[in-house]
Curated annotation (Swiss-Prot):
It comes from Campylobacter curvus (strain 525.92). This is Uroporphyrinogen decarboxylase. It is an enzyme of class 4 (lyase). Coiled coil: none annotated. Its main location: cytoplasm. The lineage of its organism: Bacteria, Pseudomonadati, Campylobacterota, Epsilonproteobacteria, Campylobacterales.
Amino acid sequence: MIFVDACLKKPTPYTPVWMMRQAGRYLPEYMAVRERAGDFLSLCKDYKKASAVTIQPVEILGVDAAILFSDILVVPLEMGMGLRFEKGEGPVFDRPVKTAGDLAVLDVDRAVKNLSYVYDTIALTRENLARDKALIGFCGAPWTIATYMIEGGGTKTYAVCKKLLYTNPEFLHQILAKVTAALTDYVKAQIRAGVDAVQIFDSWAGALEESAYFEFGWRYILQIVDSVKTEFPDIPLIVFPKGVSGFLDKISGNFEVFGVDWSTPIGLAKEKLSPKFVLQGNMEPTRLYSKKAIDAGVDKILNTMKGAPHIFNLGHGILPDIPVENAKYFIKQVQEKSHNHK
């Protein structure tokens, strides 16, 4: 698998490429399956349909890896928090974590057991996915998951979570510890089900100042990494903390790949983190609106990363209104142009 080889810094004929949110609304084939499923969560829980949309981008676009179709919030959902997705509002938890009592009723073991539909999706996908294509599992990072659990949904200010951080840090650590335990077991279960690599998404890493991030964010990611590596030392792990370009000097850990978001100059990430880590990223997603912009973006990143271990990706998820033709063009350009760079 070219993707796994790249994660492990083995020689590859070209730079492997995939896209975050590649199984998504820009694909008519995805929308057809989602319509049959009824709603987003129902699609996540129907392992046959979830597997089908996981594989779609590989077959339609020719990406080098599939990423499991699911959502980072299925873990707190199955811990016992009522979750729904409101149109125009995003995810909403019926019972946010406000007190020690709220936290106490959340069940780690129940969550890992109840997520069997995810493991079934993985097993079916690995069975039907081409042998040379990697299957990437994923989870949210503890800090990002905790923000949703405490705020009760998405937030622009993180005010409730940050108030807790500065007024009752011990309780926030308790929440993070429980979430970390659930995520660690969940990642291990995904690996047992058949994923070839795992990505940890810390979407809200950039909401914290440096000292707070390394106390309440990064340390818990490393707990997951270290525990998983103890049991599965050969499975590549990818960490994607969005918005931490100012903290790159402090990044270390027992993982293989560091995901670079589009706001971080990849040359800076290369200077700070390569070749210790394989870098993944980081084209600005809106470049996909224009083939000319795609060409320029691909050339710039390939030239910057020439000679360094690299996996090509966007610097965030693909947007719902990107033309499929442009997405195909992007994948083809990366594969063809990087072949000439090797």
